[in-house]
Amino acid sequence: MLFASQRIVSPLPGSPANLLSRISLALCMASFAATLAATHAWAADDGEDTARLLSFGGMCLNCELSGRKLPEAKFIGANFAGASMVGSDLHGAAFFGSNFNGADLAKADLHGATLFGSDFTNTDFTEANLSGVRGHGANFFGANLTRTNLDGANLLGSELERVNARDAQFVGATLFGANLTQGHFERASFKAANLVGANLAGASLAGTDFTGANLAHTNIAGVDLTEARGLTQAQIDQACGGPSTRLPAGLVARTCKAGISNVIILHSTSPIHAGAPRFIVDLGVP
């Protein structure tokens, strides 16, 4: 069940308002289905202005929306789990507290999108464009980020555990306090990226480029960095490693004196800013 509107209302179960809402929703379904089908025509006839008006809520499980043009659309508390949006144009879109678990967004264009507090567990972003996205507190657990462009992305406090990010681009990205544990980042580029307080424990980093990256307070304890590129002793001196850290020849890690970082994500209860996180960050001293 899916609907588009400028306002999302959740009446109490069994109330007259709820009954009217169901009737209204049933009546709008047919017209909205036609609206989605005509998305290409909107893009051709009216440019992006019509798509900008769309706000999506409700459920659209396993929907087929590949190739759609929905720039700057808003997804607020929406459930698009399993949806197929291959190659769709979603640049500048806003995702607040929405569920895209297992969705297929391969080759989609999401550059400049906002992904606050949304769930992209096991989502396929293969070769997608996520450059410049704001993904504070977003959950990418197990996502496929193979050859994905995340240059300049702000992923502060995001969950990237067990992702497949081989050959991905994180150039100039902010990954402050992010969890990258057990992820596959072979041949990925973190050039000039901010990895302050990030956790790389158990990550696969063969051929990964860290040239100019900020590794202050980054957890590299037990991490194998022997095949990583661009590392300097100055970077390693700022990171949190130890005897179990494996480094390229000539580099030596030091043991942390305290915890690395705690990033507490508090989600707003405001309907307008639903899913938009605030952060309290406590950095330990290595």
Question: What kind of region is each of these model predictions?
Answer:
Residues 42-267, 271-286:
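Tandem repeat scaffolds
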Residues 1-20:
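N-terminal secretory signal peptides that target proteins for export/translocation
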Residues 14, 21, 33, 47-48, ...:
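Generic hydrophobic-segment detector
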Residues 2-3, 36, 231, 269:
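A composition/secondary-structure signal for short, hydrophobic, low-basic-content segments
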